[in-house]
Amino acid sequence: MSQAYDPSQEGAKMSYAKDMSYGDYLHMDALLATHHPQSDAHDEMLFIIQHQTSELWMRLVLHELRAARALLLAGGDFRPAFKMLTRVARIFDQLNSAWDVLRTMTPSDYTTFRNALGNSSGFQSHQYRLIEYMLGNRNTAMMKVHEHRPELHAMLAAELEQPSLYHVALRALAAKTGASFAPEVYRMDNPHSADAAVQAAWRQVYEDPAKYWDLYELGEKLVDLEDYFRRWRFNHVTTVERVIGFKRGTGGTSGVQYLRRMLEVELFPELWHLRGDL
């Protein structure tokens, strides 16, 4: 019979009474103490962890988007920002895979604890709203949901004072191509809508990638990001429809119909529309 493997025989440290351990570094005790089901239903734990892990990934999305925006604002080498935007796209790919786990919960499973949720709903996520605001979909009506938490409301209001990631990209586009955009293009308190001059400038880039390589790659990184973001939204819709059908959402929205409306939002419309012009 073979002996049980003992890592200490190869020099692995096995005592952490006076040193920081894995659990200490990650604050695992605090992290694992955050799950508080409001019912005895077995599947409520799945529901909680699905949403909590999504919020953790969103925390990283915000971290990467802020850094990418700062780098683009500073000008110079865009490549570090490209890495961050690629990471954001991959995070949404990861979040897409997570829907497959939640889909193991059937409508019957969900009904065992749905009433325990009260009026809490995913559209109340301030981190998701920050992501939307940072990407340029600045629907200020959604801030009302956070009026009961002044610190969150202030955080969202502060974001509206900053240029979105796409605003920053458009400034770089104008600077490097010599294009000029109307002031409305840079408005920070409204969702961005397609602009003919912006589309023409992006077309200039895509018709000569070698000349405008940084802008060309930036455009494609933004398209990648929105592509994965759209898939995440679509998977959200199909998962909700699969679990609750066309019932109203717990937060009072129209549920699936509300989510389908979100599928129509274009974050970087000119980058999609120009493809038909090439």
UniProtKB/Swiss-Prot annotation:
InterPro entries membership: Trp/Indoleamine_2_3_dOase-like, Trp_2_3_dOase
Any one of the GO BP annotations: L-tryptophan catabolic process to acetyl-CoA
Chain coiled-coil ranges: none
Needed cofactors: heme
Gene3D superfamilies: 1.20.58.480
Role of this protein: Heme-dependent dioxygenase that catalyzes the oxidative cleavage of the L-tryptophan (L-Trp) pyrrole ring and converts L-tryptophan to N-formyl-L-kynurenine. Catalyzes the oxidative cleavage of the indole moiety.
Name of the featured protein: Tryptophan 2,3-dioxygenase
Provenance organism: Ruegeria pomeroyi (strain ATCC 700808 / DSM 15171 / DSS-3) (Silicibacter pomeroyi)
